[in-house]
């Protein structure tokens, strides 16, 4: 016999409890906000995280493509504009490129994605492919790692200027902007989730989807830890060159 469905309050509490597994607790991220990261590690994180940033609009476009509800689309499309920009607004991708320049990276090199590690690419691609194949409600719900995002952005704003004075302060605009954007996005995503998942089986399914998204974020940092902390990038026993694939256009 299946368990009774969680009440909306209980379900939201279960969702928020997943914050214990958010990547703010990953050793690589802890090193960054505790001031123990090297310049190379900060640069590696920014360059690799750029691949995530440029794919977020693709993920959101997939949700829109699968969603027949006009009101939902009208609200969700703001996420694409937040990242891609709009007339008179640079958008999050451009803000991230300014962060890259602020930590000493070359803009064109970041845009080329040549620094993106295979493990990061695989994790991000898995997320985008999930959004394309899942129902729009499932893909929308996977965004609820944003429940925990304001805390991680604030930790960077609080710690990085103190620990890394060599970073140009102009690069922090992305984190500042996401403080309010993430809270707005959470409100919408949470509303969709609490309304859609009404049975216990459906709620457990959604919690597993959220765990998948947490796995994506954690796996990205695992790949960066291997490359920049343990100094074991792909093929390190064979060559010091970046020989891994740079993405395949199909």
UniProtKB/Swiss-Prot annotation:
Which family, according to UniProt? Belongs to the PqqC family.
Record keywords: RNA-binding included?
Answer: no
State one molecular function term (GO).
Answer: pyrroloquinoline-quinone synthase activity
Q: Which UniProt keywords apply?
A: Oxidoreductase, PQQ biosynthesis
- InterPro entries noted in UniProt: Haem_Oase-like_multi-hlx, PqqC, PqqC-like, Thiaminase-2/PQQC
Tell me the route in metabolism or biology where this protein functions: Cofactor biosynthesis; pyrroloquinoline quinone biosynthesis
The function of this protein is: Ring cyclization and eight-electron oxidation of 3a-(2-amino-2-carboxyethyl)-4,5-dioxo-4,5,6,7,8,9-hexahydroquinoline-7,9-dicarboxylic-acid to PQQ.
How would you classify this enzyme at the top EC level? Answer: oxidoreductase
Q: Which organism is it from?
A: Ectopseudomonas mendocina (strain ymp) (Pseudomonas mendocina)
* The name this protein goes by in its record: Pyrroloquinoline-quinone synthase
Q: What are the BP-aspect GO terms?
A: pyrroloquinoline quinone biosynthetic process; sulfur compound metabolic process
Coiled coil regions in record: none
What is the reaction catalyzed? 6-(2-amino-2-carboxyethyl)-7,8-dioxo-1,2,3,4,7,8-hexahydroquinoline-2,4-dicarboxylate + 3 O2 = pyrroloquinoline quinone + 2 H2O2 + 2 H2O + H(+)
Q: Which domain of life is it from?
A: Bacteria
Q: Which Pfam families match?
A: TENA_THI-4
